Regions:
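Alpha-helical promoter-recognition and RNA polymerase-docking modules of transcription initiation factors
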Residues: 1-93
Length: 93
């Protein structure tokens, strides 16, 4: 559990993932806000002329949410690396 006196912005990604996995929606929202720019950066190369860029961004967000829910901090990857892989995999599929 998150101690009440620690602001969310001071928590690590790994701690926020653990909180989100236990049902803490605020922790999940914080991670989505923290990684919004990464999603947009990953989606940018796939924008097509005449296509809807928001559709790609939404697919990337689905990948980010999957990363938040499935991240296992006992593995060797830090969250950002895992999130980027999940986002790109979602964009490719």
């Amino acid at each position: 559990m998150k101690p009440d006196h620690i602001p969310f912005q001071e928590l690590t990604d790994e701690t926020l993932c653990r909180l989100a996995a236990s049902g803490d929606r605020v922790a999940e929202e914080r991670l989505v806000m923290r990684y919004n720019r990464l999603v947009r950066m990953c989606a940018r190369p796939y924008f097509l002329a005449g296509g809807d860029s928001e559709d790609l961004i939404q697919e990337g967000m689905v990948g980010l949410l999957a990363a938040i829910r499935e991240y296992d901090s006992s593995k060797a990857a830090v969250f950002r690396t895992y999130a980027e892989v999940c986002i790109k995999n979602r964009l490719f599929s």
